Structures are given as C-alpha cells and as structure tokens.
Amino acid sequence: MITVNSTSETLFNFPCDYSIKIFGKNCEKFQNTICTIVERHTHKLNPNKITKKHSSKGNYVSFSIRIIANSRIQLDSINQDLKNCNLVSYVL
C-alpha cells in the first residue's frame, strides 16, 4: 500500500523560488507596507522581482513578489502577517 504524505514540506524543496500574490485597495502606502512585511521574513527584496497590476477601474492593485523561501514556517509567517494588515484584502 502506498501512503501519500500531503504535508507542504514534501511539496516544496526548500529553499525554492516562491511567488506571493497580494491584493488590496490602491493607496499610497500599500506597496511600502507589504514590502516591509515580506522583508521582515526575507532578505531585502529585489525590485525586479516585484510586479504590479491595477484593476480595470484602478480601485484595487495586486502585487506579485518573488522570494527565495527557506521553509514552510517562513511562508506561513509571511502569509499571517500579510493577512493581519488592514490594507491587504487577499493573499495567494
């Protein structure tokens, strides 16, 4: 019988390249705030690894930030801190 271990540690080979997508209202502080949160858990972010897209009406914005992830704990911590930020609407 084959058992499948579904833990995320087995789904990723850390360290690995990982993309975080963050959505929120389009405001002045949004980019600096989310970059500061992500940098708490990683090294300085590379501006070339950050992409920004506006919604069709410009009310919302999404950022994709590529990082080198070192562990599932690190990813969970980043995700939780972003979710706790009142400027962030959604994190993928």
From Swiss-Prot:
Alphabetized Pfam families for the sequence: DUF493
InterPro entries linked: UPF0250_YbeD-like, YbeD-like_sf
Gene3D superfamilies named in the record: 3.30.70.260
GO CC terms, sorted: cytosol
Family: Belongs to the UPF0250 family.
Protein name (record): UPF0250 protein COSY_0496
